[in-house]
């Protein structure tokens, strides 16, 4: 009986070793437990019938569903790991809402910066654009506040202060008069001497005077010719008188037929020549 059990145990160990090389490591614990159950059952059974029972129980114990369940879990685990490796981490909402001075966005070939304004949270692609935008925030705003009004009741001043105030009043009135004179000069009205029209500038008055000049020149042709003829006759008379006067100045009252006196020749050369008012006539018996 003991020999039979030893043979069955050796056969089982050979079967277990052969199966262990083909199966995975995870199912080894189950095989060992199955082997212990087989050995316990084989001790109660005897002969060739016991060996068949051991082999049937072992085959039933080491069944395919158990191995498929183990491999399915490992496959699920591997799939989960692959999905985690391929997945991307989504940014949290806190990082999206946080303000950044600038952030770098890199691409395959180039990279650029985004600059954000701290006041209005606008973004710009360059620092120069951000500087120009910041200048709009720094512009001085027009103050709408009214000036403080002086109190109605002023404290009483001394005599010296009153004198100074009167002096300031006089000087202020003089300045006001000078300013009014300047304004009057600036607003001087130019008046036409012919028709009395008033103009604010000398250029306008000059343009107006041209009308009067053109009106004077546009006279009737008959009156114009009469006036021209009268003017021409007067001018001719004046010209003739002028010519006669010039001729009298050129020709002296000298008679060349009179001989020079001998006494005058003996005198000095620098003595002036004297002419008689009524020269004597030669060969005149009257």
From Swiss-Prot:
Recorded GO cellular component terms are: nucleus
Per the entry, induction is: By gibberellin and H(2)O(2). Down-regulated by ascorbate.
- Signal sequence range: none
Localization recorded for this chain is: Nucleus
Record carries keyword Transcription: yes
Q: Which gene specifies this protein's sequence?
A: ZAT5
**Protein's name in the database:** Zinc finger protein ZAT5
Pfam families from the UniProt entry: zf-C2H2_6
């Amino acid at each position: 009986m003991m020999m039979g059990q030893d043979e069955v145990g050796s056969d089982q160990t050979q079967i277990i070793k052969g199966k262990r090389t083909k199966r995975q490591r995870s199912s080894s614990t189950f095989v060992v437990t199955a082997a212990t159950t087989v050995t316990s059952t084989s001790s109660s059974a005897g002969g060739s019938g016991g060996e068949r029972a051991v082999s049937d129980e072992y085959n039933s114990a080491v069944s395919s569903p158990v191995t498929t369940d183990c491999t399915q879990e490992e496959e699920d685990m591997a799939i989960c790991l692959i999905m985690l490796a391929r997945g991307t981490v989504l940014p949290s909402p806190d990082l999206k809402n946080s303000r950044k001075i600038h952030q770098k966005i890199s691409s395959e070939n180039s990279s650029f910066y985004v600059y954000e304004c701290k006041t209005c949270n606008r973004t710009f692609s360059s620092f120069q654009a951000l500087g120009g935008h910041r200048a709009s925030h720094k512009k001085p705003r027009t103050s709408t506040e009214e000036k403080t009004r002086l109190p109605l009741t002023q404290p009483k001043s001394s005599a010296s202060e009153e004198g100074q105030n009167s002096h300031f009043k006089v000087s202020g009135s003089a300045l006001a008069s000078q300013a009014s004179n300047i304004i009057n000069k600036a607003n001087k009205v130019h008046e036409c001497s012919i028709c009395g029209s008033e103009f604010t500038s000398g250029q306008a008055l000059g343009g107006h005077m041209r009308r009067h000049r053109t009106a004077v020149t546009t006279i009737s042709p008959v009156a114009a010719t009469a006036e021209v003829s009268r003017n021409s006759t007067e001018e001719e008379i004046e010209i003739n008188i002028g010519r006669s006067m010039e001729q009298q100045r050129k020709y002296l009252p000298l008679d060349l037929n009179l001989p020079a006196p001998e006494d005058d020749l003996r005198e000095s050369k620098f003595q002036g020549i004297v002419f008689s008012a009524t020269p004597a006539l030669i060969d005149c018996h009257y």
